[in-house]
């Protein structure tokens, strides 16, 4: 009996995309904990460094330092498309950057921010702009994995050169909220009346930058709008261990 293993290029791409979509689900709890602990110490080291350059290379370098020896692709731009099922979107995915356009899109966002002037802006306007910038940068998802942690570290270091006393404390306490806020800033479904919004990210930033005490509950971000105060508060269920270190 002869079996044919010939598949089309499109079928091969679909298999590869499916692999990268599901790979994280196959990690054991011990593997996840080991990864988180290693990355946590590297985040602490990175945020203790005084050197920083606002550039694409700096962002890529942070990813490499955080995930060297953990991910084979550490510091490498992905060359495949990805999807990620999001709880906050009822299983839908954000449309991440196309693999063929990642470098160009990435560099464009950096050039736009580098040439932007914060002069004469109110604090509300500054926070809104920062929310738009960081959500756009995250949406590109230039790496296969580790984008949110890399974005958070880069963002903290960038905020510091802008004069803010940013620490990782709020990220440690609200890591899942931060990610869900980034997701909501990049998802639109007109048929369901859902529009991308930075409002949740701005609330997060107001706590971070202005020391406000706004409540950050993941249930408030869910697109169904059905999760209310009477249901279990899952706000801190998935706290990212990688941010459980203070600076």
Region roles according to the model:
Residues 1-247:
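FIC/Doc superfamily catalytic core
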